[in-house]
Amino acid sequence: LDDAGNLAWKLAWVLKGQAPDSLLDSYSTERVHATRQNLAYGAKSTEFMAPPDFGFRLMREAALRLALVDATVRSLINPRQSAPISYDASPLNLTDGAPQAGPAAAPGQPAPDARLQDGDTPRYVSESFGRGFVLLAVSPSASLARELDTLAADTQDAPHPLRVLSVGEGGLDDAHGQLRERYGASAGAVILIRPDGYVLGRWSAPQAAQVRAALAPYYPLIAQSATQEGQA
């Protein structure tokens, strides 16, 4: 399923002329890494469940006993079957523009879900995944908000348009603090999320041109719009 999720959007982009064939090269890089990680976790789980020697049995007993009283030890007995793989070395990742926000939502990481509020209606960040790219903007300035809306408008004729989720005054409300906690994002931050729910890039206070440049390889209409504006 993860293989399919990784490949589906890339195939769609290439087949619909939104990206060059080279985008498909990242599939092998990312999923070979994931396979190696899964094999390593599988070996770890097997050795934990069926210790091959006395040393492994001793370690397992110690971990099980400590896990009852120390939560930090519990990860040792977690086979990681419920957590997605990160793509830390993906060639698609952009340079991290907000390293101070912490590792949880860095480029290459699965974008954490967070519950937001649209008035009385709950909205989850993950509801926007699965089709186009998503820009998550946290309390953007008025000028940046206008620029991001313009970017989204420039992609409306694309097969899978860009979506902008604005959080803060006039937008969605981080009433439960989950976005702030899980993304480490402060006012002015912008996070760019791939269609498969992985973080492509993030910035603490970007210029609109930075965001436009990040999206241009996936939305030719954005590049065309920028060229037309420059000629005007």
Regions found by a protein language model. Give the residues of each.
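Helical substrate-recognition/capping region of FAD-dependent monooxygenase/halogenase enzymes
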Residues: 13-232
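A conserved FAD-binding loop/helix module that cradles the flavin
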Residues: 1-3
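Active-site-adjacent scaffolding segments
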Residues: 5, 9-15
